[in-house]
């Protein structure tokens, strides 16, 4: 941030695979809430989720459940896969500080893992999920 404005910005606009929606879908497949997934992940050993596509990852999670893989391991694997994707995007905007907006911000474990992977603090806020909507409203107001 320079002069109150965002200097570098990275966004996953290709698919849902690095988003809060991805976590919602995976939590639903596990039969738990996103908050429960974060708590479960704390005690899990990461199971590799190799699919980058939400549809294929969902099938992979269903298969893991069917094979009896512990849900905490799947939860950890899902979160680690999202964090890895986000860290790759954030790494393109080299250097701290990092700010995270969107649905992922509501998962404290995601924010914690992302900070660990980037080796730098990640800042967010309670309204971060609505950053896009707030920005659109400010822009619309400026146009009127």
Locations of the language-model features?
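Acidic-glycine-rich active-site phosphate/pyrophosphate-binding loop
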Residues: 1-3, 52-59, 104-119
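Residues forming the flavin
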Residues: 5, 9, 108, 135-140
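Glycine-rich phosphate-binding loop plus the immediately following alpha-helix
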Residues: 5-42, 46-49
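Active-site nucleophile and cofactor-binding loops and adjacent substrate-binding regions
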Residues: 10-18, 77-78, 99, 104, ...
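Glycine-rich phosphate-binding/hydrolytic loop that grips phosphoryl groups
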Residues: 20-24, 28, 125-144
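Histidine/lysine/aspartate-rich catalytic loop segments that bind and position anionic ligands
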Residues: 39-65
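Adenine-nucleotide phosphate-binding core of ATP-dependent small-molecule kinases
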Residues: 57-90, 129
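Glycine-rich phosphate-binding loops at beta-strand->alpha-helix junctions
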Residues: 90-117, 128-132
């Amino acid at each position: 941030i320079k002069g109150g404005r965002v200097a570098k910005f990275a966004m996953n606009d290709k698919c849902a695979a690095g988003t809060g929606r991805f976590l919602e879908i995976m939590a639903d497949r596990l039969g738990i809430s996103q908050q429960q997934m974060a708590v479960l992940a704390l005690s899990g050993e990461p199971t590799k989720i190799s699919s980058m596509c939400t549809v294929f990852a969902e099938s992979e999670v269903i298969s893991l459940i069917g094979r009896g893989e512990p849900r905490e391991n799947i939860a950890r694997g899902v979160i680690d896969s999202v964090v890895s994707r986000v860290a790759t995007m954030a790494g393109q905007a080299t250097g701290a500080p990092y700010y995270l907006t969107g649905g992922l911000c509501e998962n404290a474990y995601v924010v914690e893992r992302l900070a660990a992977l980037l080796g730098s603090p990640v800042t967010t806020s309670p309204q971060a999920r609505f950053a896009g909507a707030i920005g659109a409203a400010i822009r619309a107001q400026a146009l009127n």
